[in-house]
């Protein structure tokens, strides 16, 4: 029986981290977690990490698509924060970011890790950006690396 399972060490992986500027005080913590995980755990070289900033989470899918189409990256990590407010805006932005990033992954056949927080309030966002609920940016980065390795194994099998 053959079992394929990716590891998180990917020293030669080229990774784009796409980060929304809106809610930057949260997103910068996600970015710090992602970069730390890529370098320290994934052993990705500094020169193989590209950071791209978008205005907000809604713009993440288009930028991720362009990066995927460039064929310069093995994986993309998308980071952002969408916090529910008093209008339907939350549903539109969160839904489009989620479905758009998923579409990029499927269409381009490249791992696109979803590190976009979709929370009810600021407290939940802070908890998920490096306090008691961990750092979802770091988790997304490690997911991206594991998927890079898993896809390589599938292609070689």
Swiss-Prot record:
Q: Give any GO molecular function from the UniProt entry.
A: 6,7-dimethyl-8-ribityllumazine synthase activity
Q: Look up the EC number in the record and give it.
A: 2.5.1.78
Detail which positions bind 5-amino-6-(D-ribitylamino)uracil: 22, 57-59, 81-83, 114
Query: Where does the record place the catalytic residues?
Result: 89 (proton donor)
Q: In which pathway does it act?
A: Cofactor biosynthesis; riboflavin biosynthesis; riboflavin from 2-hydroxy-3-oxobutyl phosphate and 5-amino-6-(D-ribitylamino)uracil: step 1/2
What does the entry list as the binding residues for (2S)-2-hydroxy-3-oxobutyl phosphate? 86-87, 128
Alphabetical GO CC annotations of the entry are: cytoplasm; cytosol; riboflavin synthase complex
EC class, as a word, reads: transferase
| NCBIfam families cross-referenced by the UniProt entry | lumazine-synth, PRK00061.1-4
Under the subunit heading, UniProt states: Forms an icosahedral capsid composed of 60 subunits, arranged as a dodecamer of pentamers.
Name of the molecule in the record: 6,7-dimethyl-8-ribityllumazine synthase
Source species of the chain: Haemophilus influenzae (strain ATCC 51907 / DSM 11121 / KW20 / Rd)
């Amino acid at each position: 029986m053959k079992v394929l399972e990716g590891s998180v060490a990917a020293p030669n992986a080229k990774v784009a981290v796409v980060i929304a500027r809106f809610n930057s005080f949260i997103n910068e913590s996600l970015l710090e977690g992602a970069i730390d995980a890529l370098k320290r755990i994934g052993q990705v070289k500094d020169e193989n990490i590209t950071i791209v900033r978008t205005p907000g989470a809604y713009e993440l899918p288009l930028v991720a698509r362009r990066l995927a189409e460039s064929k310069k990256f093995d994986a993309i990590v998308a980071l952002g924060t969408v916090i529910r407010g008093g209008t339907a805006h939350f549903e539109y932005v969160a839904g489009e970011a989620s479905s758009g990033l998923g579409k990029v992954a499927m269409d381009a056949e490249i791992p696109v890790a979803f590190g976009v927080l979709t929370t009810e309030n600021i407290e939940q966002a802070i908890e998920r950006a490096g306090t008691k609920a961990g750092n979802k940016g770091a988790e997304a980065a490690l997911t991206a690396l594991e998927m890079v390795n898993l896809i390589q194994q599938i292609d070689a099998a």
